[in-house]
Structures are given as structure tokens and as C-alpha cells.
């Protein structure tokens, strides 16, 4: 049979394309030469093109620990068909160096050959996680006894009169009502008063209760509606002998738990502050990672416990398919935390958001900064605020320079591409809190303040807080820690900043976030 010239052309082109234009992995985890890596980490390789799953084999992975020796494992291809996951059969050992060599020969579905990979990393010296209960007790200013947190099934499907509520339900006092939006209010109180319980609650604009669910022991954080119509909240759990960990509880519209999300790879303390359910069925969340660090070069304790943060993306099967650790990217000296204490809360992250291009925005309270993380490579695209700020500010209050916002919470991306955040304002003189909206020019690195709301008189929330823009242009502000001392817990403002709705709870009550979502017989769509 005579072969055509066209056949030979495509054959030669295919060979040249494979040899001269080899493919590469866009993302690899753990990062090469990284330190303090979890003993239970998986290995992640991501290509920009779909992988030929039939060519994947555990034999392509040569994983060796200097103490634990050779590690066999299993290989999976994630649901994006681009991300290869290797799960060692046994954990690594503390304080060992791990060498990973991936053979050349893995192919994309169109036959392109991916290169070999060689990375090294060092594991954590810890054989067991550090107990975080004392750190969290201080963070949330808890005076009550720590118990296992457990949501009870008491909820109601209609508006309730005050005298039909439990005796420990917090009183809601509406102080202003001026044509607020129609959505229902979603929040959970954090009580510092023994006579008042912790509740997930859905409220009408007049303060009456649509649904509630009591949380026994600690509290629920960030009660909200997910894009799929389910609801979620963050849950702190304290297990004997005092080790703390967190999780996110997903519920149906009857407030019945249907799923649980936690960080993987051995990062046990899922920080229950931010959980995103993405359109592709994946989820984003992050963990606190306490590690022993010699802080004497910074004037601190040579045996300090320092907390880093670990962002994870989980696929629909809850495999970790993306992992980003502050240890790998952020210098210790970027933090405004006291570096001389025995326990250093270095980062104190509190919120995740996804930008219009799919990349991650990460709010770090103790750095007074927001960073944008490239979700395909893990690289930092930019830093807004803090010691490494890359932006020039326009229309801002120059008396707040250089940290125009500080110790912030609750980063969100608006449909027009602008971002909102709750500026706690800890570094303002004097301190005051506000909601802000910035228009970012990522190319020219400018941040233009296009909206802000300061309460009159000023309110200072030393911790927590939220800002949410509604579809009708109104904005919701949750005042976080400030409401525990008699300030408003919730304020809704019109586009002209006149107050549409405001209410308080008794002293000793605060809310991590206060939000609004549509609610009728069920839940309509919601933004993350």
C-alpha cells in the first residue's frame, strides 16, 4: 500500500511536536524543597492538557524516605482529567527527607509525552498534631467549658412569636427599618453569656424567627446558603484529650446534616471560617497548621509553636487536587503578629474567594493583606495590602496609610470584578471598622476605593465581621466582635449609605458573619 505525502507530513509533525515541544506539569505538590510537610500528604501533578489514564501506573512513581524507605501507593486521575494523584500506602516518618521521581512517559490523550519529575521535601518533626484548644479558646474569648459541638434538631418552618422560642434564644431588637431587601437574614450567634445559647438562625426583617437550630457546646460559624441550595456552617470540635479540629457541615433545607467537609492530607484542623462550593463540584477550604519553629532569629522563643495555613481544593470525591501552604511562599517577617510569644498566630487567614478568572483570593488578617493565588500553578499573582503591598491606592483616606485596610475579614468578588471586604481597621488611628469596595487594575497595580461605609458613630470590631453586596445594590455589614459590647450586630444600607435595617442582640453576643439570601419554601440560587 502506498502512503500519501499527507500521512508522512502528519507523522513527522507529531514526532517533532513531541520531541521539540515537550509538555510539562504546570503544578506539583508538595513544592520542591518544601519544609514541615504533613506525614500523610499525597503527591499532585497537574498538566494543562487531558491525561491518558490508560498509561498511568504506580510504577511511574519512585517515592523514597530517608527513614521510611520505599513507598508503594495508588494512582488516580481526578475528575478534571488533568490532575494526577499519588497516594502513598503508608505515612512518611517525622523529620525525614522525601525524594520523589516520576518517570518520563506519562502521556496526554493526544500522545504528547510528559517529562520526568524529581522533587524533594522534608516532613514535619511532629508525630502527632499540636493541640490547638488553648489557642482557640483565646481567639474566641471563650469563658464557658469546652464540649463536643453538636447541633440539635430543633427547628421550625414558620415565623415564631418570641414567647415560643427557647428561653436561651437571644433577643433580637430591630432599631431601624427603612425598606430593606426581601431576602432572609442568615447568621449564627457566638455567645459569651452562659444564659444564652448558640444558634443557627434564619430571620425576617422584623427580627422574627423563620428557622433556628441550636448548636451545643461551641458555635457555628458562617451560616449561609450554598450555590446548590443547601446550607452550611463551620463547626469547631474539641475531642479528648483536648485536641481541636474543625469541619463544615452541609445541610438540606430542613437543616438536616447531609455531608461533612474537612481538609485532607493529614491537616486535621480545618479552620471553620471559609468554605466555597464551586460550580464544578469541587470545594475550597483551608486548615491551620501549627508547627514547632525556632523563632530566636526574630527575637522569639527557640521552641515556639507557629501556625501556618494550608489551602486545599477538593474534587467531587474529596481528593486533595490543589494544595497551597503559607510556609512555601510567605516570609515570617511579613506578619504583624507578635513574634516573641510562645504561640505565634502568624497568618490568621479568615476568608477565601474565587476571582472571575478562577484564581483564589486569600484574606490574611495578621498580614493585613489579600493575595491572589494562581490556581493552575500555585504562584502568587499579586499582593494587596501589608508589608509587601504591590498596589497604589486611589481615593483612600491618607490618614490610614500605609495600611489603608488592616486585620480585614470576608473578601468577596462582585459581578463587575470589584472586591469588597470588611476592614476591621485595627491599625487605623484611632481604630475603626468599615465596609469597603475596591476597583483593582491588576496590570497597573492600582486599587481605587469606589465605596465605603462607616457607621455613625464609628464602630470598631476587633475581630470577625462581613460585607455582602445584594442584587438590589444594598449592602449587608456584620459587625463581628463589636456587637458583643452593645453595638449593632447587623446593618443593611442602601446604595446611598442610608440605613435600611439594623438590629442588635444582648451584650455578650457576636456573629462571625451576617448575611442575606433568598428563602421561600426552599432556597433559590446564591452566590458563594
Indicate residue ranges for each PLM-predicted region.
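Acidic, low-complexity Ser/Thr/Gly/Pro-rich repeat segments typical of extracellular/periplasmic
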Residues: 22-132
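Generic marker of residues within folded, mature protein domains
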Residues: 12, 20, 35-37, 51, ...
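Short, solvent-exposed coil/turn linker segments
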Residues: 2, 38, 52, 294, ...
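Intrinsic-disorder/low-complexity regions
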Residues: 16, 31-32, 59, 78-80, ...
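Bacterial Sec-dependent N-terminal signal peptides
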Residues: 1-24
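Short glycine/proline-enriched turn or capping motifs at secondary-structure junctions
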Residues: 6, 114-115, 507-508
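Proline/serine/threonine-rich low-complexity linkers at boundaries of modular beta-sandwich domains
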Residues: 18-27, 522-527
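Histidine-/acidic-rich catalytic cores in large beta-rich domains
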Residues: 124-528
Amino acid at each position: 500500500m502506498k502512503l500519501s505525502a499527507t500521512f508522512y507530513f502528519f507523522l513527522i509533525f507529531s514526532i517533532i511536536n513531541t520531541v521539540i515541544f515537550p509538555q510539562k506539569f504546570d503544578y506539583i505538590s508538595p513544592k520542591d524543597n518544601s519544609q514541615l510537610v504533613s506525614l500523610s500528604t499525597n503527591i499532585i501533578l497537574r498538566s494543562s492538557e487531558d491525561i491518558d489514564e490508560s498509561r498511568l501506573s504506580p510504577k511511574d512513581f519512585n517515592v523514597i524516605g530517608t527513614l521510611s524507605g520505599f513507598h508503594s501507593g495508588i494512582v488516580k486521575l481526578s475528575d478534571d482529567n488533568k490532575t494526577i494523584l499519588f497516594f502513598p500506602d503508608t505515612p512518611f516518618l517525622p523529620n525525614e527527607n522525601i525524594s520523589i521521581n516520576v518517570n518520563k512517559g506519562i502521556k496526554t490523550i493526544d500522545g504528547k509525552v510528559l517529562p520526568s519529575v524529581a522533587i524533594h521535601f522534608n516532613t514535619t518533626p511532629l508525630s502527632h498534631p499540636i493541640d490547638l484548644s488553648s489557642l482557640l479558646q483565646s481567639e474566641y474569648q471563650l469563658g464557658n467549658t469546652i464540649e463536643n459541638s453538636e447541633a440539635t434538631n430543633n427547628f421550625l418552618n414558620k415565623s415564631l412569636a418570641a414567647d415560643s422560642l427557647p428561653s436561651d434564644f437571644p433577643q433580637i431588637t430591630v432599631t431601624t427599618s427603612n425598606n430593606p431587601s426581601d431576602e432572609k437574614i442568615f447568621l449564627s450567634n457566638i455567645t459569651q453569656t452562659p444564659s444564652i445559647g448558640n444558634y443557627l438562625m434564619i430571620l425576617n426583617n422584623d427580627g422574627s424567627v423563620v428557622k433556628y437550630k441550636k448548636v451545643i457546646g461551641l458555635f457555628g460559624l458562617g451560616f449561609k446558603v450554598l450555590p446548590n441550595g443547601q446550607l452550611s456552617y463551620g463547626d469547631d470540635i474539641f475531642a479528648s484529650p483536648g485536641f481541636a479540629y474543625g469541619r463544615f457541615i452541609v445541610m438540606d433545607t430542613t437543616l438536616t446534616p447531609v455531608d461533612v467537609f474537612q481538609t485532607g492530607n493529614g491537616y486535621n484542623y480545618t479552620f471553620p471560617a471559609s468554605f466555597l462550593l464551586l460550580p464544578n463540584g469541587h470545594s475550597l477550604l483551608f486548615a491551620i497548621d501549627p508547627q514547632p519553629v525556632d523563632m530566636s532569629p526574630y527575637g522569639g522563643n527557640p521552641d515556639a509553636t507557629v501556625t501556618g495555613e494550608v489551602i486545599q481544593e477538593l474534587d467531587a470525591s474529596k481528593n486533595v487536587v490543589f494544595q497551597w501552604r503559607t510556609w512555601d511562599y510567605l516570609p515570617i517577617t511579613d506578619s504583624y503578629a507578635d513574634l516573641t510569644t510562645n504561640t505565634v498566630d502568624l497568618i490568621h487567614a479568615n476568608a477565601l474567594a474565587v476571582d472571575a478568572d478562577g484564581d483564589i483570593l486569600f484574606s490574611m488578617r495578621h498580614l493585613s493583606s489579600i493575595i491572589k493565588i494562581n490556581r493552575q500553578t500555585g504562584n502568587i499573582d499579586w499582593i494587596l495590602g501589608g508589608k509587601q503591598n504591590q498596589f497604589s491606592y486611589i481615593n483612600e483616606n491618607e490618614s490610614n496609610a500605609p495600611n489603608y485596610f488592616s486585620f480585614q475579614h470576608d473578601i468577596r468578588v462582585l459581578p463587575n470584578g470589584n472586591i469588597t471586604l470588611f476592614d476591621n481597621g485595627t491599625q487605623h488611628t484611632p481604630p475603626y471598622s468599615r465596609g469597603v469596595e475596591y476597583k483593582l487594575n491588576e496590570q497597573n497595580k492600582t486599587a481605587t476605593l469606589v465605596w465605603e461605609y462607616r457607621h455613625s458613630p464609628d464602630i470598631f470590631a476587633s475581630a470577625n465581621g462581613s460585607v455582602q453586596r445584594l442584587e438590589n445594590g444594598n449592602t449587608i455589614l456584620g459587625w463581628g466582635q463589636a456587637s458583643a459590647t452593645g453595638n449593632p450586630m447587623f446593618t443593611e444600607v442602601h446604595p446611598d449609605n442610608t440605613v435600611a435595617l439594623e438590629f442588635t442582640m444582648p451584650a455578650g453576643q457576636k456573629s462571625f458573619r451576617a448575611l442575606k439570601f433568598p428563602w421561600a419554601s426552599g432556597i433559590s440560587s446564591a452566590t458563594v
